Amino acid sequence: MSLDVRTITPSESAEWMRAVSTGFLTAGTPSEELVADRFAGADLSRTQGAFEAGRCVATFRSFAQELTVVGGATVAADAISGVTVTPTHRRRGLLSRMMATDLAAAKERGEPVASLIAAEYPIYGRYGFGPAAWTSVWEVSVYRAGLDARRSGQPADGGRIEMVDGADVRKLGPEVHGALAARQPGVVTRDERWWRQRTGAAPSSAHEKWTEPFYVVHRAADGTVDGLMTYGTDDTWGDAKQPLNTASVRDMIALNPAAERALWHYLCSIDWITTIRSGYRAPDDLLPLLLPDPRAARMITNADWLWLRMLDVPRALEARTYGTEASLVLEVRDDAGLAGGRFLLDASTGGARCVSTTRSADLVLGVAELATLYLGDESVRRLVDLGRAEESRAGAATTADAVFRTGRRPWCPDVF
């Protein structure tokens, strides 16, 4: 039976969502409310499906996104999501066909990069994607943290913690997140639907059961909101009637270390909470060092997270700033023919110029490896040692590391 791979029509949105749910191991039919919310304002020209006898057996969509790069500028990204293939139709090239169509369209639109969160590591490298930012989850033993159990939940520097509700977060959150996005490489845009969904004002995905969380904000001494946290708790008691409750952070953004410290210390101060799970944080997050005993924080997850794919090398490299002034000739290899070439990068702390060149290459690397370097998280020397990049000029890897690396690691707090 033939397979029809194409963009979907409005009447097929519910069937497409059913296939997505199947791919994410959630049985059943999505509600009409969820389908309507998911497709409100959606660009169906960027929503693909594979159909067999009217049944959707593979899904793929993309949407417009802004990605913060090193230096605080943003680039337009082709954000890819909802990628599934029904188990009965694996290994038929369906993802490859949909990916090729989408990336070609993104390049035609002029988007310098594509982005995604990879559910599985081995899938996306063959399409030119590389892991550009990692994520970590920390588990904190409150009893071992070394904080004074008699303290209040309020900071001592004139700031204060306030409990708020979802409506407050929808009003205050976008400004705080926007300020974070202006400085943190790896942050991606959050639209209105994101805030509505994470505060219960819009239906959650079929595989995400909604429970109302707690919301708090941190106000600086002048009253400015410079941090917010969303968290849930369980209800667990030991045999001796001792509380063994865990607070699990769903979202936490802070614009300075004082706000970050105040929010974590507040969470540690709540009666009955004995364990904290941090949610997705940067691997070099300050959390352990904000506790008197950093060993109370144990990293329980450290994994690749945000994957990028270069579509326009000069535009992407010119968008970010660099650690030092240097010139490098990069030969970028791309089997898909979308972004390969030889490029001269004149980098500086204030920006860069990147153009095609015929000069001899200093470094030879794949398009996926360049994506891995783009936000400053990976070492060129490591890639050379692994055989994933070639140093054509002695010392080029050391120079490239000085150019690309950053003092703090990139971080993408979101799933999309």
Swiss-Prot record:
Its EC number is 2.3.1.-. GO terms for biological process: aminoglycoside antibiotic catabolic process. It comes from the Bacteria. GO terms for molecular function: aminoglycoside N-acetyltransferase activity. Keywords: Acyltransferase, Transferase. Acetyl-CoA binds at V83, T84, V85, R91, R92, G93, L94, L95, S96. Residues 3-150 form the N-acetyltransferase domain. The active site is at Y124 (proton donor), F416 (proton acceptor). The keyword Ion transport does not apply. SUPFAM superfamilies: Acyl-CoA N-acyltransferases (Nat), SCP-like. HAMAP family: Eis. Homohexamer; trimer of dimers. Belongs to the acetyltransferase Eis family. This is Uncharacterized N-acetyltransferase SGR_3976. The lineage of its organism: Bacteria, Bacillati, Actinomycetota, Actinomycetes, Kitasatosporales.
